Amino acid sequence: MYHVYIVECVDGTFYTGITTDVERRILEHNYSFKSAKYTRSRRPVRLVYSAVVGDRSAASKEEYRIKKLTKAKKLDIINKKN
């Protein structure tokens, strides 16, 4: 089972990704060299959105869709979930 997630970086920007283990991935973003290059220089990050998506293909498509959105549209998604 895959998850699409959005983290908010310390500078107020958002990073969107996919994973099978959200908790592990957030720890990697904050403490590991396995994190995305984008988040390594913007630590700490905090999870602001997570959604379960069926398989890797569907998760990748949803990740791509979210990454194309404006910051305002991403905020709408985050606020609707919370």
What spans do the regions from the language model cover?
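GIY-YIG nuclease catalytic motif and its immediate N-terminal context
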Residues: 1-34, 40-53, 57-67, 72-82
